[in-house]
Amino acid sequence: MTLFSDSARLHPGEINSLVAHTKPVWWSLHTDAHEIWCRDSDRGTSLGRSIPCPPALCSVRKIHLRPQVLRPTSPRNISPISNPVSGLFLLCSPTSLTIPQPLSPFNLGATLQSLPSLNFNSFHSLVETKETCFIREPKTPAPVTDWEGSLPLVFNHCRDASLISRFRPRRDACLGPSPLAASPAFLGQGQVPLNPFSFTLSGKSRFSGAGASTPQPLLLHP
């Protein structure tokens, strides 16, 4: 999950190095949902389309973190959270990404190497939680992630592995409304769908060389 960045050009060797230094104790992922979300601004959101998406569409892979496998303590002595967190992988590219089963840091690295045409600068990783707060504007409510809730706690556990992320809201024409809006099975009864926000991985000094841009600071409003 934490291998993708829109601010650094990653080569297979760098990916392997990053995978090798990623500790599965908190990185463990599993794919509860296998849908591929493709959205066209004219036709709305479609579910279950696993075909390669043309540039006008977005291919989104939904996976889930297992917070219970996070480290029991972090540098700030933060306990693991119990709230589920979902990760959304957004690939704005003609190529669809197929994640093998079961997902692990090792076969994910192999998957990335098998996609030499993948442009990492157009690959954005999205994170959502079920905890939301709302900023109401004159026209419509704008749901945003509750940044004081579960999400920062997850990534605080990653600080010692040099994988801390900097978050920022992202406005992208190909996103439109949240693709989770049509997924009551994921949201649960009475849950409110979120607008996705992208984050840029800084990886401390690992990707701070040539070709990397400085991530934008965290913004708490659209």
Swiss-Prot record:
It is found in: Nucleus. Induction: Down-regulated during differentiation of ES cells. Expressed only in fetal ovary and in undifferentiated ES cells. Keywords: Nucleus. GO terms for cellular component: nucleus. Its main location: nucleus. The keyword Nucleus applies. This is Embryonic stem cell-related gene protein. It comes from Homo sapiens (Human). The lineage of its organism: Eukaryota, Metazoa, Chordata, Craniata, Vertebrata. The gene is ESRG.
